[in-house]
Amino acid sequence: MEKVYVAGAIPEVGLKLLQEHFEVEMYEGKGLVDKDTLIKGVKNATALISLLSTNVDKDVIDAGKDLKIIANYGAGFNNIDIEYAREKSIDVTNTPKASTNATADLTIGLVLAIARRIVEGDQLSRTTGFDGWAPLFFRGREVSGKTIGIIGLGEIGSAVARRARAFDMDVLYTGPNRKEEKEREIGAKYVDLDTLLKNADFITINAAYNPKMHHLIDTEQFKMMKSTAYLINASRGPIVHEQALVQALKDNEIEGAALDVYEFEPDITDDLKSLNNVVLTPHIGNATFEARDMMSKIVANAAISAVQGEKPQFVVN
């Protein structure tokens, strides 16, 4: 029986599928798998199930001389050297569609949380308390009738747009390509990035990360935004220059931010933690039972397909 190395615990539904077809070796230590353990694990393995936090570089790929597939448990795959994997004739797959609804739900949840100061209100209620209802007390912003600007109208961005329309929001979007069919379906308008930044009340980042996207939102971009704007990032941390965001918040260039991802993840800068006009969540975009189970099945089936000589779904290289 061929071996699969699983770089961290995954939901049981996928693990059982793997156990039917492979000898399964899984990292069960505390924290993230370290490089030496990963290199040891991929030796003699036909398949590797990697997590978003698993750095699969050339050394790891070279150690996995028998690898046919690296099935990444996540929609992103910038943790893997996919070009080198291609050179070695190793398929790399991801789990794109499984994350769509969960991440879109969280994105809209972050919009509501920061606009209506939900987390801040929860903290107040649990600590000092409040004196009662008052006309000027704890005011936030309404979402209905506002403009949402979506950076990246892929599967997740489109799902965010549909949810935003249910709140009677106007939808702007930007990206490398105009998507006229989706515009008609959703009721969205394509604009360039600068126009989006200048006009949106809520700016959500739902684009995939690549080197060209690094620090797409920096000091110059914050200066374009409305002083009442909110930035929401449930995509990848390095798309936003974190220190520039901190400065924009401190200088009241924008009203607030809600983040599920961070530039130096898992580290979160103390400056962000100290600000009241920021909502922070620990990279839980697709952390639902439904999404994580589906992702588990997708990576398992991809590994099974590869060892059976079939082309797996969702190959990215």
UniProtKB/Swiss-Prot annotation:
SUPFAM superfamilies membership: Formate/glycerate dehydrogenase catalytic domain-like, NAD(P)-binding Rossmann-fold domains
Residues the record marks as active site: 236, 265, 283
Record carries keyword Nucleotide-binding: no
Keyword NAD: yes
Pfam families xrefs: 2-Hacid_dh, 2-Hacid_dh_C
Any GO molecular function: oxidoreductase activity, acting on the CH-OH group of donors, NAD or NADP as acceptor
Organism domain of life: Bacteria
List of residues binding NAD(+): 155-156, 234-236, 260, 283-286
Enzyme Commission (EC) number: 1.1.1.-
UniProt entry keywords in alphabetical sequence: NAD, Oxidoreductase
Family to which the UniProt record says this protein belongs: Belongs to the D-isomer specific 2-hydroxyacid dehydrogenase family.
Protein name: Putative 2-hydroxyacid dehydrogenase SAB2178
Organism of origin: Staphylococcus aureus (strain bovine RF122 / ET3-1)
